[in-house]
């Protein structure tokens, strides 16, 4: 394969991996540990 093809595949894989990890963090099991600032200060905004 050419160098440009390998670089493109590497960067595409990196982007897909990062996106998958971000989705897992936002909606998967670790999301239970995230705090919700709107829920903490919900009464102050009214």
Curated annotation (Swiss-Prot):
Signal peptide: none annotated. Its main location: plastid. It holds the Pfam family PsbN. GO terms for biological process: photosynthesis. GO terms for cellular component: plastid membrane; thylakoid membrane. Keywords: Membrane, Plastid, Transmembrane, Transmembrane helix. The chain crosses the membrane at residues 5-27. It is a single-pass membrane protein. The keyword Plastid applies. It comes from the Eukaryota. The keyword Lipid metabolism does not apply. It is found in: Plastid membrane. Belongs to the PsbN family. May play a role in photosystem I and II biogenesis. This is Protein PsbN. It comes from Cuscuta gronovii.
């Amino acid at each position: 394969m050419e160098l440009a093809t390998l670089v493109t595949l590497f960067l595409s894989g990196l982007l897909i991996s990062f996106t998958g990890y971000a989705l897992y963090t936002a909606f998967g099991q670790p999301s239970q540990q995230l705090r919700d600032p709107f829920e903490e200060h919900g009464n102050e905004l009214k």
